[in-house]
């Protein structure tokens, strides 16, 4: 269930205040580590189950994240995203909350950084996402049933801006899109696919070494 993220607006305002800081250039062989927080906001329409009779809605969640990026060339890096498990409540129209699940969505991306020697450096990336679901629980109208959500592979896109704090660190504001579609089983029977396809808004501190 996608909503406007106050986290993104607040972090963008803070980043603009740092625009006068020294630049953090990124060259071949450099490594960066980023630590921050992201809100995973599934798209507003998460699909239907049981032949289209049950409309699904998956809630947002926010958790700490970490990234590591290695620059294979000047301005061009390979990044890995990891996070603490995100937890989402699952709602069905007319039935309310019927369960929850946790997931981990690691992403590997190839990213190009524009103006990496400047104080403000936007970047774009594309890659692959693998999402694993676990700790599924049921409640409400589905209490007592066994819910299983299958793992998912999909494409991912990444865009953001780095605002240099000094020559070793920057404040990053970014947004990701991930293609996450999970086949759902209830008591061992396939009942459809949940289309999560979230945007992940975030802010982090990125350190170069």
Model-derived regions: residue spans:
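Cleavable N-terminal export/targeting peptides
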Residues: 1-29
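N-terminal targeting signals for Sec/Tat export/insertion, comprising classic cleavable signal peptides
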Residues: 34-64
């Amino acid at each position: 269930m996608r909503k406007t993220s106050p986290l993104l607006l607040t972090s963008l305002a803070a980043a603009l205040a740092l625009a006068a800081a020294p630049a953090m250039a990124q060259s071949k062989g450099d490594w960066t580590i980023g630590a921050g927080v992201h809100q995973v906001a599934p798209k507003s329409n998460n699909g239907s189950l049981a032949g289209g009779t049950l409309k699904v809605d998956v809630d947002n969640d926010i958790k700490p994240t970490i990234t590591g990026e290695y620059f294979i060339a000047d301005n061009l890096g390979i990044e890995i995203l990891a996070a603490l498990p995100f937890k989402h409540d699952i709602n069905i129209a007319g039935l309310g909350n019927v369960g929850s699940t946790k997931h981990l969505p690691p992403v590997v991306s190839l990213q190009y950084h524009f103006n990496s020697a400047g104080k403000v450096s936007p970047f774009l990336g594309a890659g692959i996402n693998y999402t694993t679901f676990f700790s599924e629980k049921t409640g409400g109208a589905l209490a007592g049933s066994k819910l299983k959500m299958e793992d998912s592979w999909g494409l991912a896109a990444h865009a953001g801006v780095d605002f240099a704090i000094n020559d070793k660190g920057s404040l990053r504001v970014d947004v990701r899109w991930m293609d996450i579609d999970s086949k759902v089983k209830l008591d061992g029977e396939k009942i459809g696919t949940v289309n999560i396809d979230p945007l992940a808004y975030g802010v982090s501190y990125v350190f170069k070494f």
